[in-house]
């Protein structure tokens, strides 16, 4: 299968640099494509399922390209990012931040109806909310237990603590 070059995933209109209003992000698509391909080739060579995080680029076009060249799915941090990717037709999503609160759980349930989203959690209350959202969506939600690997930001701190949200 031949994968189109990265530019085919975007609608790009040439602009003279002097016409750009600053500040403006500018990327070299050739370099981006080379880096994404290099990383995917490395993952493939090691037998790793690549699930790139879109928190830096947040572009559906780049995510689609990453999937086209072999990424298993896309990782998102926030519900809005997941919704944007789903609106762009991407359905294999992993959300790496707890979903808490009734409004967000309703949005998560709506998203779960149209995607294969999975999510991480680090405590039983979050898992209970996700189970409720799954029932509302009419499907089981895959939940991974987040473990703190030393950054002391999120996640459970021990194997014993991991068993608690896993129920």
Language model features with spans:
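A non-catalytic, amphipathic alpha-helix used as a structural packing/dimerization or gating element
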Residues: 30-38, 164
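Short, surface-exposed alpha-helical recognition segments that flank or form part
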Residues: 27-30, 118
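Active-site-proximal beta-alpha core segment in soluble small-molecule metabolic enzymes
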Residues: 53-167
């Amino acid at each position: 299968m031949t994968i189109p070059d990265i530019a085919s995933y975007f609608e790009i209109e040439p602009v003279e640099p002097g016409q750009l209003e600053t500040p403006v992000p500018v990327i070299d698509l050739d370099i981006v494509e080379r880096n994404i391909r290099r990383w995917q080739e490395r993952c493939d060579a090691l037998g790793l399922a690549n699930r790139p995080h879109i928190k830096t680029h947040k572009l559906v076009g780049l995510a689609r390209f990453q999937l086209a060249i072999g990424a298993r799915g896309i990782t998102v941090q926030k519900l809005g990012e997941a919704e944007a990717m789903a609106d762009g037709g991407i359905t294999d999503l992993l959300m790496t931040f707890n979903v808490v609160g009734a409004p967000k759980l309703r949005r998560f349930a709506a998203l779960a109806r149209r995607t294969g989203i999975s999510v991480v959690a680090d405590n039983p209350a979050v898992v209970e909310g996700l189970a409720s959202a799954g029932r509302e969506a009419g499907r089981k939600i895959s939940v991974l237990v987040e473990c703190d690997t030393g950054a002391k930001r999120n996640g459970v701190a021990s194997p014993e603590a991991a068993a608690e949200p896993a129920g």
